[in-house]
C-alpha cells in the first residue's frame, strides 16, 4: 500500500510536506510520525504500509529543512516552533479514534516534549525509538562552548551533523540506500544544534511529569544515541503510568531497518492494538482528541453628548413668543427700519471677534503642530541615539565575544599542545616500562624455567631414588630369602619343593612388578614429555600474549607468580618432608619387623626341629608376601598420589597462568583500542579545531569587514544626523521666531481686548446711570398715572375698559420692540462677555425685591421667559431709545411694587403669579406712552 503526499502551510509561511498512509477500511487509530535528523518520511514506506494494512492511518511529515519541505536544510529556529509544526500535523488526525505520537531519534525527543507540553491534546500513546536524550558519544566541552557562542551569533549557519551512515544499521543495503538518497543530508544549523542538545538533556529531569502511555524502544548496540539515557528516562517516569521498555540486541540505531525489522513492526502493532482495546474498555463513547476554540468578543460603547439634547426645550419654549408677535411685526415696520444700522455694527464686531478667535485657533493649531513636530523630532532623535548606542554596544559585545572565542581557541590550542606533550611523555614512559617489564619477564621466565628444570630433576631423582630403594629392598629381601633358603636347605624335600615353587612365583611376581614399574616409568616419562611439549606450547602462547600485556598486568602477574612460587615451594617442602618421613618410617618398620621375624625364626629353629622350621618357613613366606603386597600397594599409592598432586598442581598453575595471560591480553587489547579511539578522537578534535580556527578566522574577517562597513555606515548616518540636526535647529529657530511674533501679536490683541473691556465697563457705568435716571423718571410717571387713574376711576366707573383697550393697543409697540430685538439676541449669544455683565446686574434686582420675597418666587416659575427678557434688556443697553424706556419703566414698576403699601395689590400679586407679568406689560405700555408723550413735548 503506497502513500499520498500533500502540503500544509505553517504560521510562519513555511511549507511542510505531509505523507499519508490511509487504510482501505475505516481507521481504528491514527499515528502522527516524526522522523529523525537529516532524513525524511519517505524512508518509512515499508513500516507504515504494514500499519495501513492493519487499519491504522499514519500522517508523517518532512520536518522544516528536511525532505521536500521548505526551509534552510537542517535548521529549525526553536523547540517551540517544531512543536507547533507537530501540532499542525496532529490537528489533521481523526478525532473519533485513538491517536498516537511516534518519533524516531531526534523525532523521539520532539515526541516526548510534545506529550509533556501539549496537555490539551493528550494522545492515547507515545512510541519512541532510539530517542535522542543524550548522544552516544559525549560532546566535548570545546564543541559545546564554541557551539553556544556561534549558535547565538549565527543561528542559521549550518555545519555537518557528524552522523556516520555505517552506524544506522547492520544491513549494508540500508546503509547504501541511505548514502544514495538525495533527500538525505548531513547538515544541522548552529542554533538548532544548541537548543537540540540543551532541550534533549532536560527530558530526564522532566520524566516525572510524563503521564502518557509509553513504549520506549532502543538498541543496545546503538552508537548514535545513548541507550542508558533511555533507561534513565524510563526509570524516572512514574510507576503509575502505563510504560514499556524494549531493548533489542545486536542492532544499531534504526531498529526498523535491521534484519529483524518485520519482528519489530509486529511488536509495535501489537502494542498499539492493546492500547486501542484498553481505550475502548475505559471510555467506549468518548472521543480521544478534543480541540477547544476560544472566541473573544469586543464590545464598543458610544457615548453621546447631552448638551444638544438639553438645549432643545429652550428653543421650543421660545417659539410661541415669536408667533404671538407676528401681527405686531407688520405694524411696526418703521421701528425695524430705524434699528437696522445697529445690527450691522454688531455684525462687524462679531465678525472681528470670530476672525480673532479663528486666528487664535489657527495659531494654537500651528503651535500644537510645532510642538508635536518638535516632540516627534525629539523622540526620533532619542531613538536614533539609542539605535547608535545599541549598535555600538552590539559591536562591543561582538568584539568581546570574538575576543572570548579567540581566547577560548588559544586555550584549547594550548590544552591540545599540552595533551600532545603529555601523550609523548606517556608513550616514552610506557616504552621504558614495557622494556623493563620485558626484561623482568624474561628474567622471571628464565628463573621459572630453571626452577621447573630443577623440579623436574628433583622429581626424576626422587623417582630414581625410590626405584633404587625398592631395588635395594628387593635385593635385601632376596638376600634374606637366600638366607632363609640356606636355613631351609635342611628342610624336607617336600618343603624344599614348595619353597622353590614359592620362590619361583615370587621371582616371577617381582619380575612382573619390575616390568610394571618400568612400564609406568616409561609412561611417566612420556607423560612428562607431553607435558613439557604442552608447557612449551603454552609458554610460547604465553610469551605471545604477554608481549601485548600492559605494565599493570605485568605487575599483577609478578605478584601472582611470586605467590605461586611461594605456594609451590611450600608444597614442595611439605611433600619432600612427608615423603622422607614416610620412607624412613616404612624402612624402620620393615627393619624392625624383619629383625623380629629373624629372631623369632632363629628361636623357633633352635627350639623346634623340622616342624618348627617348616612352620617358620610358612610363616616367613606368608609374611614376605604380606610385606611385599603392602610395600607394593604403599609405593603404588604414594606414587599415584604424588603424580596426581603434581599433575593437578601443574594443571592448575597452567590454567591460572593462561587465564592471567588471557586477561592481561584482553586488558591490553582494550587499552590499545581505547588509545586508538582516543587518538582518532584527538585527530578528529584537531581537525575540528582547525576547521573552527579557519571558521573563526573567516568570521573574524567577515566581522572586521562588517564592522568597517558598519562603521562607515554609522559615520555616514552621523553626518546625515548632523545635517538633520542643523536643519532641525534652523527650523526650530524659524519656529521660535514665528512663535515670538505670534506671542507679540497675542499680546497686542490682549491689550486691545483690555481696552475694549475698559470701554465696555465705561459703557456699563453710563448704562447704570441712565437706568437710574430712567427709573426715577418712570417712578414719577407712574405716580402721575396712578393719580390720574384714581381720579378717572372715581369719576366714571363705567368707562374703565376703554382705557384698558387703549393701553392694550399702546402695548403693541412693545411687542414690536420684542420682535426687533431677536437679532440682538443672536448678537448677545456671540458677545459672551456682555452676558456675563448682564448676570452681574441680577443681584441688584434681588436687593430691590428683598421686601417682597413672594414676588421673587413668582418670577422663578417662568425662568425661560424671565431670562429672555433680561437678555433683551441687556443687549439693548443704550442703543434703541424705546427699548431703554421699556427697561426703565419695568424697573420703575418693580421699585414701585416693592414700595407700594396697598394690601389689595400685594394680595393680588401673591395669589395670581401671572398677572404681574401682564401688569408689567401694561405698565410698560404706559411707561412708553408717557415717555413718548414726554418726548413729543
Curated annotation (Swiss-Prot):
Keywords: Acetylation, Coiled coil, Hydrolase. Residues 309-402, 411-431, 469-489, 512-532, 600-615, 667-687, 738-758, 780-872 have a biased composition (Basic and acidic residues). It comes from the Eukaryota. Gene3D superfamilies: alpha/beta hydrolase. GO terms for cellular component: membrane. GO terms for molecular function: lipase activity. Pfam families: Hydrolase_4. Residues 290-308, 898-924 have a biased composition (Low complexity). This is Uncharacterized abhydrolase domain-containing protein DDB_G0269086.
